[in-house]
Amino acid sequence: NTSAPLFDALGDHPSITLVTATREGEAIAVAAGLWLGGAAPLIVIQNTGLLESGDSLRGTASRMGAAVPMLITGRGYAKMAKAGITPDEPRTRAFLTRPDVDTTAPLTEPTLDAWGIPFERCEEEEYAAATILRAIESARTEERPTAAIIACPLN
């Protein structure tokens, strides 16, 4: 799980308050509310959860122009690369039913595009921090949700 070491580090950090949610859509709404109250939230979410949270992201954070950056851990990207597949693979029935593909990864980026969420994908751990910082800065500058997809393990 890419998120586990990150949650451990965040939970131990003295100046970060970790707020967990029961559902991913709830996390989006809570972050938008925190932003509205003057906080600077960062949503940490797996790409499967991103797909579940669509209505909250569209109907709350995006519509209100909430500067809420998302760190999206990229389930399925390693498996996709191992199978020789790129994120822009045509999403045909044959592709989506392949047993060697976790379709979460190839659906993540088109979904963000459809929702109008700017994103950047990082596939190497050494660039993860810079990618996340760019998403945070972009959210603040553009006053909208943004995303950093971390498609590599974080140690």
Identify the residue ranges that each predicted region occupies.
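Thiamine diphosphate
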Residues: N1-N155
